[in-house]
Amino acid sequence: MLSQFKQDGKKAVLGELFDFEKDVYPVGRLDADSEGLLILTNDKSLNDKLLKPSNKHARTYLAQVEGQCSIEAAAQLEKGVTISLDGTLYNTLPAKCEVVFGEPVLPERYPPIRYRKYLPTSWVRLTLIEGKNRQVRKMTAAVGFPTLRLVRESIENLKVYGMKPGDVISISGNELYKKLNIK
């Protein structure tokens, strides 16, 4: 599903999930290969308040990576790594990184990731305060562990726990601002 409302090709779009009002739009984006939390709002000021890196709002992702992610790679991710953005080298801001032991409880992905019998996978939890295009995927690849599956599990204290793909919940503006630590 694409994080847009109008049909563009063969992929499903948000407008097919629910009859949203005309002035509702997504805050940020999820690419077509990513899953998880997406905030939809009619608050035009929220995008800047939430996504501007100087405001330091944490976004946490679970990434299933190819191979067994090492403690050394996690330490590199925490310090920040160099990635390419539109052909220009960019040093990411430091991030929180945790190697997740075991399989996180997540809904099945459709379509499933490619499976290779002799290639192990592992999970890392990355918390960023910036959101460059395909940043998590580029960061994990930069330390030798390409991302196979990517799930945004939270933005600040707003979490997807207990939700299924396609679930839509409605919360008040005050409650949203409180969960997002926006004053």
What are the roles of these predicted feature ranges?
Residues 1-183:
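RNA pseudouridine synthases
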